[in-house]
Amino acid sequence: MKIQLIAVGQKMPDWVKVGFEEYQRRFPKDMPFELIEIPAGKRGKNADIKRILEQEGKAMLAAAGKGKVVTLDIPGKPWTTEQLASQLEAWKNDGRDVCLLIGGPEGLSPECKAAAEKSWSLSPLTLPHPMVRVIVAESLYRAWSLTTNHPYHRE
């Protein structure tokens, strides 16, 4: 199983890249974790946001291919570390790749939300999208460590 984090936006600050890569490199070879960046549509005062969301959504779903789509969205379901670890095990047993979708400034397209098999809420707060990349990477690594009795996660 491969985990793909599919996110709208490129050219993130250095701290985002460093933070994400710190956890990305820790994943085992049998569970690769990769980042796919989708270019954000050009936004301006007269931008057609509905059209931009639709284009970003199509690109995200194309990148996901046949993978299991999981959206990161405020109205999604919050998971504890233990619940995420159980979810990770279920995904591994399913055998399909898992594609976690992070939208842009206006969130995810309706098509992405409709395609999602699950929706995960990190917080009821609106979080900066660059920060979400690092939080997701750390959370998934922590969940993996729990499933393998690795000492990273402590009760």
From Swiss-Prot:
It is an enzyme of class 2 (transferase). One of its GO terms (molecular function) is rRNA (pseudouridine-N3-)-methyltransferase activity. GO terms for cellular component: cytoplasm. Its main location: cytoplasm. Gene3D superfamilies: 3.40.1280.10. It is found in: Cytoplasm. It holds the Pfam family SPOUT_MTase. The keyword Ion transport does not apply. InterPro entries: Alpha/beta_knot_MTases (IPR029028), RlmH-like (IPR003742), tRNA_m1G_MTases_N (IPR029026). Keywords: Cytoplasm, Methyltransferase, rRNA processing, S-adenosyl-L-methionine, Transferase. It catalyses: pseudouridine(1915) in 23S rRNA + S-adenosyl-L-methionine = N(3)-methylpseudouridine(1915) in 23S rRNA + S-adenosyl-L-homocysteine + H(+). CDD domains: RlmH-like. Its EC number is 2.1.1.177. S-adenosyl-L-methionine binds at L72, G103, L122, S123, P124, L125, T126, L127. The keyword Methyltransferase applies. HAMAP family: 23SrRNA_methyltr_H. Specifically methylates the pseudouridine at position 1915 (m3Psi1915) in 23S rRNA. This is Ribosomal RNA large subunit methyltransferase H. It comes from Actinobacillus pleuropneumoniae serotype 3 (strain JL03). The gene is rlmH.
